[in-house]
Amino acid sequence: MTHLSITDQPIDVAAALAAVQTTAAGAVNAFVGTVRNQSGGRPVRRLHYESYDSMALTQLGHVVAQAYEKWPMLQAVAVVHRKGTLELGDVAVVVAVATPHRAESFTACQFIIDTLKQVVTIWKREEYEDGTEWVAAHP
């Protein structure tokens, strides 16, 4: 079971967790990425995310397919990414996975978020007091 979404609406973390709930899983793990108030020592006011949704969702589907290959015991995966303008504290991305045991849930979740940031074409612009800057989504 897989749920992938790019949205301009606030992310419902509970809904992402519910999307991966299954009685076959003894572990549900989630990464929740939020907008922080600084980056590289500079105060951040807000973030702007842009994406070409169909391409980004295709790429995200490939990332999740790789996760299912690496961890065949994966029961479910949900990935929801925001686009548009996000304020400090807003949820930018949620990755949730369900597996029979906890160890695989941690490693699969980390693989998905790390790979997403490397290969999925979602662009991030940081807004500061003195201007804006496009930044790499994968430091």
Where would I find each of the regions flagged by the language model?
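N-terminal, polar/charged subdomain of small-to-medium soluble alpha/beta proteins
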Residues: M1-V91, A98-P139
